[in-house]
A protein has these predicted regions:
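C-terminal-of-GTPase-core extension/linker across diverse P-loop GTPases
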Residues: 1-95
């Protein structure tokens, strides 16, 4: 495991926690960029298969993605022992 993969797994855990069985396990999370200074800035992509999956992950008025992001950020802060800024982007996977 590298750091990016580990952080992606934390976000994946957040997705499974907040969306229960609504979304199939075909979702993948990729850590694009990690910037370390006084704190961590982490950019991740959540790759989904269909537009309907994207809508489910975003949730009404962005509530689902916000909950996933907050949970993931707090978990990352526990592990990394410093403040984190987490930026999530939901992207439709190209077939």
């Amino acid at each position: 495991y590298n750091e990016g993969t580990f952080l992606a797994e934390i976000t994946r855990e957040g997705i499974l926690k907040y969306l229960n069985q609504e979304i199939p396990y075909q979702i993948s999370v990729i850590t694009d960029k990690i910037i370390k200074s006084n704190n961590y800035t982490i950019h991740q992509k959540i790759l989904v298969q269909t537009l309907s999956h994207k809508k489910i992950i975003l949730g009404k008025n962005g509530h689902s993605i916000k909950a996933i992001g907050s949970y993931s950020r707090l978990e990352m802060e526990k592990v990394l022992k410093c403040k984190c800024n987490l930026f999530l982007k939901v992207v439709l996977k190209k077939r």
